[in-house]
């Protein structure tokens, strides 16, 4: 059994077939790195177990949400951890002064929730429909009106 599959409650969420790995080897950049596997954790506990396996086996992990990076940050030849599907929560707090969102929530979805409070995230990447908060935090994109 693949130790990364054992870190997930449902081992079917570790994708090792060539077709699954090939479709995730590109982000929006020209770089192409074929991951060893693609993991789809559903919660922080599974992410923690993936980190433990990664450290124990010396296999690097890279997180991917929207795959909109123009610089190759969403690619790896290690384990690719896809947060797009299961980490989309958005909680607007304090009348829009704060927002708590998962790394898979898109900038557009967060801004739609904040608009009800007369607020939005800035700056604004052109890829807001696909760009996620995980990328915004980890890759510091500037956007069109910076």
Describe each PLM feature range.
Residues 64-66, 102, 124:
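Structural motif
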Residues 1-56, 66-97, 126:
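N-terminal flexible segment immediately upstream of the FAD-binding catalytic core
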Residues 86, 97-98, 105-110, 132-133:
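Short, structural beta-strand-to-alpha-helix junction motif
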